[in-house]
Swiss-Prot record:
Role played: Conjugation of reduced glutathione to a wide number of exogenous and endogenous hydrophobic electrophiles. Involved in the formation of glutathione conjugates of both prostaglandin A2 (PGA2) and prostaglandin J2 (PGJ2). Participates in the formation of novel hepoxilin regioisomers. Negatively regulates CDK5 activity via p25/p35 translocation to prevent neurodegeneration.
Every GST C-terminal domain range: 83-204
A GO cellular component entry from the record: nucleus
Keywords annotated in UniProt: Acetylation, Cytoplasm, Lipid metabolism, Mitochondrion, Nucleus, Phosphoprotein, Transferase
UniProt GO MF annotations: glutathione transferase activity
InterPro entries the UniProt entry points to: Glutathione-S-Trfase_C-like, Glutathione-S-Trfase_C_sf, Glutathione_S-Trfase, Glutathione_S-Trfase_N, GST_C, GST_pi, GST_superfamily, Thioredoxin-like_sf
GO terms, biological process: glutathione derivative biosynthetic process; glutathione metabolic process; hepoxilin biosynthetic process; prostaglandin metabolic process
Reactions listed under catalytic activity: RX + glutathione = an S-substituted glutathione + a halide anion + H(+); prostaglandin J2 + glutathione = prostaglandin J2-S-(R)-glutathione; prostaglandin J2 + glutathione = prostaglandin J2-S-(S)-glutathione; prostaglandin A2 + glutathione = prostaglandin A2-S-(S)-glutathione
Family annotation (Gene3D superfamilies): 1.20.1050.10, Glutaredoxin
Enzyme class, first EC level, given as a word: transferase
Domain GST N-terminal: 2-81
Full protein name: Glutathione S-transferase P
Gene encoding the protein: GSTP1
Compartment(s) where it occurs, according to its Swiss-Prot or TrEMBL record: Cytoplasm; Mitochondrion; Nucleus
Length: 210
């Protein structure tokens, strides 16, 4: 039986980064898909610590909060930098990813039609810090922190992939980020996952907007 279980809605949402991570690390996991109808009944929601999904099970450990789950996997699988300095940088970058993801979620679920143009115009300013970070690490030819992959690489990759759907060409003026996405997406296990029905057929968001 797979050691990990993801309990979530039938979307990529906040779980696709951890799925990409698990796939790339050769880990197996089980999906328990929760429909909106089931969720609205309230019985599952009442058992969730913060009243929200995802819920993640690692053996007898149950976790909520997607970034806590990513950090747990980072520690468990050696994806948290090679020392405390790198771990601090990984945390910093992950907070930056979360900031932009929250902006994206607000756009998708509350003001997509009226807010998309302004969001896309402001997007370069939000992407620039990640380009800068890459430029400061081995000329952008490695990972976002250090010389080995960390959990934040998977989170950033997912964030960039969904923004390429929202705003095709958004990385055209960011050559390091563009190469970074191509490089990570070409890793054999990530490439296989991104081309699999599990990824391709799963909507990005729950309301059909992307």
């Amino acid at each position: 039986m797979p050691p990990y279980t993801i309990v979530y809605f039938p979307v990529r949402g906040r779980c696709e980064a951890m799925r990409i991570l698990l796939a790339d690390q050769g880990q197996s996991w089980k999906e328990e898909v929760v429909t909106v109808e089931t969720w609205r009944k309230g019985s599952l929601k009442s058992t969730c610590l913060y009243g929200q999904l995802p819920k993640f099970e690692d053996g007898d450990l149950t976790l909520y909060q997607s970034n806590a789950i990513l950090r747990h996997l980072g520690r468990s699988l050696g994806l948290y930098g090679k020392d405390q300095r790198e771990a601090a940088l990984v945390d910093m970058v992950n907070d930056g990813v979360e900031d932009l993801r929250c902006k994206y979620i607000t756009l998708i679920y509350t003001k997509y039609e009226e807010g998309k143009d302004d969001y896309v115009k402001a997007l370069p300013g939000h992407l620039k810090p990640f380009e800068t970070l890459l430029s400061q690490n081995q000329g952008g030819k490695a990972f976002i922190v250090g010389d080995q992959i960390s959990f934040v690489d998977y989170n950033l990759l997912d964030l960039l992939l969904i923004h390429q759907v929202l705003a095709p060409g958004c990385l055209d003026n960011f050559p390091l980020l563009s190469a970074y996405v191509a490089r990570l997406s070409a890793r054999p296990k990530i490439k296989a996952f991104l081309s699999s029905p599990d990824h391709v057929n799963r909507p990005i968001n729950g309301n059909g907007k992307q």
